């Protein structure tokens, strides 16, 4: 039984190497960026709940569509200042700073934007480079 299993694994490994080697030899098709001149692209996030790891990807998407010639709008539909320990510890300031860097154009208020009180919300709206 061990010999049969060993033979099976050897054949499976050889097949996977052969498939991988042949795939590497084929040239990848060159993907060209689409011409989106005159187009409007709307990107949005919602219920991020302090998940700050995704803001770099959001910024990259906005930059990509701008590079393709599109006019890009980036919005958030609320609940961005609570959830992640880093964002919660700063009472949303970290999220707003990252949203500034990502190039958000506007953000709506969700119920969690009121978790730290009205005064904090006013402070965050002054820090933001976009209307909240």
Residue spans for each PLM region:
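Sec-dependent N-terminal signal peptides of Gram-positive bacterial secreted proteins and lipoproteins
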Residues: 2-23
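Acidic, metal/ion-coordinating pockets
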Residues: 24-132
């Amino acid at each position: 039984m061990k010999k049969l299993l060993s033979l099976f694994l050897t054949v499976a490994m050889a097949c996977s190497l052969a498939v991988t080697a042949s795939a590497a030899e084929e040239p990848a098709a060159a993907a060209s960026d689409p011409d989106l001149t005159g187009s409007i692209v709307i990107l949005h996030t919602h219920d991020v709940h302090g998940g700050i790891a995704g803001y770099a990807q959001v910024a990259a998407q906005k930059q990509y569509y701008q590079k393709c010639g599109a006019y890009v709008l980036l919005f958030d539909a609320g609940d961005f200042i609570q959830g992640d320990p880093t964002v919660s510890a700063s009472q949303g300031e970290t999220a707003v700073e990252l949203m500034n860097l990502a190039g958000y154009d506007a953000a709506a208020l969700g119920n969690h934007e009121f978790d730290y009180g009205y005064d904090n919300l006013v402070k965050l709206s002054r820090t933001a480079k976009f209307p909240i």
